[in-house]
C-alpha cells in the first residue's frame, strides 16, 4: 500500500456530496438488506449489518427505511430481492485500473450498464484477473477530525487492534487494516470514545498512477457514469492527483 492518497480525500468529499443528493440512499439500503440476509437481522450478532446501519445513519437515511431493509433481508417482510455480488474489471483513460463491485438481481442488466459506461467514457472492460491483482481487500475506517484529535491519538487507539496505517485525508483520518481486523479496529475506536463515519472492507490499490487535471476529469467522468447505475455499489481506481490538480477539480 502506498502512502497517503489525495484521491481518498476527493472520494471522501464526493461521498458527502453524493449523500446530499440522495444518490447513495438506495445503495446503502441494499447493503443493509444483503447484510441482514447473509448474517441475520440482529446487528449485535452481525458486525457487517451493524456497520451498514451505522453508515446509513451517518448519511441521514431515515430510520424507517433502515428498519424495513433489515426486515426484508431477514425475511420478516416481503419484497426482498435476491442480490448477487459481481465484480467487473477494466481500464479508465490513461491506463488507470478500475474495479467495479455490483450488487444486482439482474446480471444481464448490470453487465450492460457497466459495458456502456466504459465504452462511452473512453475506457475498456478487461478479462477477469487482469486488474484485480493490483488491489487487495482491506479494512477501511474513516474517522472525522474533531478539535484536538491528531493522527497519533487515532493510531494509539487502534494499533493493538490490528491497524496498519493511519492516513490524514484533510477533513478525516483513514485507518487501514487487514479486512479480517476491521471489526476489532472499529471496536477499539468506539472503546476509546472516538466517532467514525464508516467502517467497511474496500479494495485498496497497491500502487497508484498520478494523473493531471485532464486525466483526472476523464477518470472521474467514467466513475460517475458507473455509479449512476443502480446495480453498481462501489468503484475502486488506482489513480492519485496532486493538491494542485485537486484544487482545479474543485473549481469545475
From Swiss-Prot:
Gene3D superfamilies: 1.10.10.200, 3.30.70.980. One of its GO terms (biological process) is regulation of DNA-templated transcription. GO terms for molecular function: DNA binding. Keywords: Cytoplasm, DNA-binding, Transcription, Transcription regulation. Belongs to the TACO1 family. NCBIfam families: PRK00110.1, PRK12378.1, YebC/PmpR family DNA-binding transcriptional regulator. This is Probable transcriptional regulatory protein Bcav_1989. It comes from Beutenbergia cavernae (strain ATCC BAA-8 / DSM 12333 / CCUG 43141 / JCM 11478 / NBRC 16432 / NCIMB 13614 / HKI 0122).
